[in-house]
């Protein structure tokens, strides 16, 4: 009998969600994703600290933003030596509400990758799913820079990303689950709210169904998992990005994995189309307390980790 990881691969592209590229080798993911928190975690390990020190030393005196991007690209290049597919590298979360600055930073990251001999087709630029971020992605896609819209918690964000023609979205399963569990308090029933009844799983399933019903080409990559049950309940999603710990657990567990998500049947009723435009986006997002709160919280967390990464680079003598 196959492992659950092997069985999952029959339905879904498996992506490693980590900056720890050495851990990836045994798990053989197709793609990999990184973010400021994962890179910060990696460079605090003895195995990866020399990479930070080398980048800081080689580019001492350059603007701190450039040195940070060079560190992200250094990790990305190492990852691309391991995975056959793509790596996602994130634009500084401090630019989440600045369309022009996001575009400029994304261009800079792609230029660094291309200067290192990496084709832009192997890189996804991660951008927070704010209105400003989505508009930046719209223009970047037109330039051939493929984007991964992250910190996505709602169908309204997903619909705006589809309309903008982005390459891929990353709806966050675990953080949606966290919000609903906290909101329910003592009324939360873990057994009843697991698997296909998990609110995070249901959110991704709705987005997936909406995209497939309307023929949206944007890829859906479920992210931010708390347990393997959430992962297995989304078998059939275009991609799933999974932490090394949960990948190892799937690899160590035997069992078939049934298909959970699939294309709609011919003639199936279309879900209600969401209105487009900035006013509708901001209004509908504002009405969704969970999505509004988790988007703001996610940006704050990534900004905090970006600042801590800056501090490490300064301590290493980069600036």
From Swiss-Prot:
Q: What is its main location?
A: cytoplasm
The entry's localization annotation reads: Cytoplasm
Please give the pathway this protein is involved in.
Answer: Carbohydrate degradation; pentose phosphate pathway; D-glyceraldehyde 3-phosphate and beta-D-fructose 6-phosphate from D-ribose 5-phosphate and D-xylulose 5-phosphate (non-oxidative stage): step 2/3
Its GO CC terms are: cytoplasm
- UniProt entry keywords in alphabetical sequence: Cytoplasm, Pentose shunt, Schiff base, Transferase
Q: Which GO terms describe its molecular function?
A: transaldolase activity
Please give the biological process terms from Gene Ontology that the record holds. Answer: carbohydrate metabolic process; pentose-phosphate shunt
Which Enzyme Commission numbers does its entry carry? Answer: 2.2.1.2
What are the positions of the active site?
126
- Return the InterPro entries for the record: Aldolase_TIM, TAL/FSA, Transaldolase_1, Transaldolase_AS
Q: Which reaction does it catalyse?
A: D-sedoheptulose 7-phosphate + D-glyceraldehyde 3-phosphate = D-erythrose 4-phosphate + beta-D-fructose 6-phosphate
Describe the task this protein carries out.
Transaldolase is important for the balance of metabolites in the pentose-phosphate pathway.
Q: How does it assemble?
A: Homodimer.
What does the sequence similarity comment in the record state about its family? Answer: Belongs to the transaldolase family. Type 1 subfamily.
> What is this protein's record name?
Transaldolase
The species this protein was found in: Bordetella avium (strain 197N)
Organism taxonomic ancestry: Bacteria, Pseudomonadati, Pseudomonadota, Betaproteobacteria, Burkholderiales
């Amino acid at each position: 009998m196959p492992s659950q990881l092997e069985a999952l691969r029959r339905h879904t592209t498996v992506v490693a969600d980590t900056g720890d590229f050495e851990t990836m080798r045994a798990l053989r993911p197709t793609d990999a994703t990184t973010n400021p928190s994962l890179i910060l975690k990696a460079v605090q390990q003895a195995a990866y600290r020399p990479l930070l020190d080398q980048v800081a030393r080689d580019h001492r005196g350059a603007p701190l933003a450039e040195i940070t991007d060079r560190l992200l690209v250094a990790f990305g290049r190492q990852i691309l030596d391991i995975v056959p597919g793509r790596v996602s590298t994130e634009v500084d979360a401090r630019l989440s509400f600045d369309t022009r600055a996001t575009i400029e930073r994304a261009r800079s990251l792609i230029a660094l990758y291309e200067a290192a001999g990496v084709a832009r087709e192997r890189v996804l630029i991660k951008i927070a799913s704010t209105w400003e971020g989505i508009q930046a992605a719209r223009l970047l896609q037109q330039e051939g820079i493929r984007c991964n819209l992250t910190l996505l918690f709602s169908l309204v964000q997903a619909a705006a990303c589809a309309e903008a023609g982005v390459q891929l979205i990353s709806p966050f399963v675990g953080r949606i689950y966290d919000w609903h569990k906290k909101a329910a308090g003592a009324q939360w029933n873990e057994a009843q709210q697991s698997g296909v009844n998990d609110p995070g799983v249901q959110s991704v399933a709705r987005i997936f169904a909406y995209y497939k019903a309307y023929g949206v080409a944007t890829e859906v990559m479920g992210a931010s998992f708390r347990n393997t049950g959430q992962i297995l309940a989304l078998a059939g999603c275009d991609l799933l990005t999974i932490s090394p710990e949960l990948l190892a657990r799937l690899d160590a567990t035997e069992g078939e994995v049934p298909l959970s998500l699939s294309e709609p049947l011919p003639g199936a009723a279309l879900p209600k189309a969401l209105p487009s435009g900035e006013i509708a986006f901001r209004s509908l997002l504002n009405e969704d307390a969970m999505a509004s709160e988790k988007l703001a919280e996610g940006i704050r967390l990534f900004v905090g980790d970006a600042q801590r990464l800056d501090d490490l680079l300064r301590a290493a003598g980069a600036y």
